[in-house]
Amino acid sequence: MAKEINTIGVLTSGGDAPGMNAAIRAVVREAIAKGKKVKGIKRGYAGLLQEEIVDMEAKDVSDIIQRGGTILQTARCMEFKTPEGQQKAAEICKKHGIDGIIVIGGDGSFRGAQKLAALGINTIGLPGTIDLDIACTEYTIGFDTAVNTAMEAIDKVRDTSTSHERCSIIEVMGRGAGYIALWCGIANGAEDILLPEKYDYDEQKIVNHIIENRKRGKQHHIIVNAEGIGHSASMAKRIEATTGVETRATILGHMQRGGSPTCKDRVYASTMGALAVDLLCEGKSNRVVGYRHGDFVDDDIDEALAMQKSIPEYQYQISKNLSM
């Protein structure tokens, strides 16, 4: 017999992502529509262990769908990674009458949800990360906003780069995944794209590319560099010393995490939030919501974490073909 869900907890964990508030809003309002109570858990698993738990009503999520960040705040928590911390978290959930938890975050957050599910707390994960690095889904909450933020910033850098006939290296987020760099590289017409998945790049080829473009009369050279490659400032110095072309590095940093979410992030996050509530109400647990082949889906967290994701080779190749 499926476990009856009366009270649903919701938390955000790991790095924040635009659209998390839209997901929280959907969780609260869908749960209320189904006659359930909702408790917001502040600061992720750290807040759960500190019992930073508040009742949430429909009014508490008014006027947040357009806001970046997360009203529940987020934090990383080493204590929760221990068996003792996980057991304590499960006991706190039971103490506060929380029957199920919706966890918005990345792979690490899902591993936490997996542990809670094993301890009798029904859990559903929502993919919330700007990196688009969760294998079970083609969409993650926040990626669309982050990549548009980066694209607009790179457009502005290109303007001044062209005026001064510079080479510009723009470093975007993505330690282990180069999706922001790849998408921006294509969208911004970058001459070179550096991805952590393609770490064996040849700097001499970049130098040759810059020199060839100068001979063709090109007035700028844009290099989009994922933070997993990094070292943009030192790379800029080497390129300038070798080519004689003025080269500047710009690190976009945490601005990519902020800002009002795009329409896509608001709609998809809202849909995922509502679906997570529906899954809990159906008695499901240890599931993660995703988006594949034009539809919203859910997978077993164990299976989702075992999936592998790689940069689309065709997209990478066309990015090189288009970067003349």
Give the location of each predicted region.
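Glycine-rich oxoanion-binding loops at beta->alpha junctions
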Residues: 2, 48-101, 108-109, 141-148, ...
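N-terminal phosphate-binding or glycine-rich loops at protein starts, especially the Walker A/P-loop
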Residues: 2-49
